[in-house]
Amino acid sequence: MSYQENNAMPSIMDALVPMVVEQTSRGERSYDIYSRLLKERVIFLTGQVEDHMANLVVAQLLFLESENPDKDIFLYINSPGGSVTAGMSIYDTMQFIKPNVSTVCMGQACSMGAFLLAGGAPGKRYVLPNSRVMIHQPLGGFQGQASDIQIHAQEILTIKKKLNTLLAEHTGQPLEVIEKDTDRDNFMAADDAVKYGLVDAVLNKRD
């Protein structure tokens, strides 16, 4: 993954973020669409899971908890996955804060995205009908001295065991089934993700 320097020109997507204008007693106030939805306790987790994105999601979760610790937070996920450590910082915060975090998959939730989807509050994990969910084992590649490669290989096995154990808890599947099903890329349609226990229901239309 490549990163742009801080002084790089903004991307087209950055330039095209819609703005919402509201009338208040003090006049007009404008928000970008994501900030406006944050007021409604909606957080978007989109794209690669990496440290910068994880920090933003964690900050929003903590902010919404401070605003109202008893009201649900809605986390919309459209992600191909990414860094395990970045994803675990989001996961641990979801479990730590007092509000229930309802997760919704739109588009795709793969790898760490699927793990975070399953980590939502029980009974409040959803998938849109044409979304795809994919689980697999952690990926890694290392270079260097043989002893260092051995250390990193052991770390990957430790992470794999931890992720599989947590996924078994969230899905209700036996650990042996999780280990077998995550050995290779395992794609699921919306209904299959419900049957597997990664989510609780398919959302076709808002009530």
Swiss-Prot record:
PROSITE patterns: CLP_PROTEASE_HIS (PS00382), CLP_PROTEASE_SER (PS00381). The keyword Electron transport does not apply. It catalyses: Hydrolysis of proteins to small peptides in the presence of ATP and magnesium. alpha-casein is the usual test substrate. In the absence of ATP, only oligopeptides shorter than five residues are hydrolyzed (such as succinyl-Leu-Tyr-|-NHMec, and Leu-Tyr-Leu-|-Tyr-Trp, in which cleavage of the -Tyr-|-Leu- and -Tyr-|-Trp bonds also occurs). The active site is at 111 (nucleophile), 136. The keyword Heme does not apply. It comes from the Bacteria. Fourteen ClpP subunits assemble into 2 heptameric rings which stack back to back to give a disk-like structure with a central cavity, resembling the structure of eukaryotic proteasomes. Belongs to the peptidase S14 family. GO terms for cellular component: cytoplasm; endopeptidase Clp complex. This is ATP-dependent Clp protease proteolytic subunit. It is an enzyme of class 3 (hydrolase). Its main location: cytoplasm. It holds the Pfam family CLP_protease. Cleaves peptides in various proteins in a process that requires ATP hydrolysis. Has a chymotrypsin-like activity. Plays a major role in the degradation of misfolded proteins. GO terms for molecular function: ATP-dependent peptidase activity; ATPase binding; serine-type endopeptidase activity. One of its GO terms (biological process) is protein quality control for misfolded or incompletely synthesized proteins.
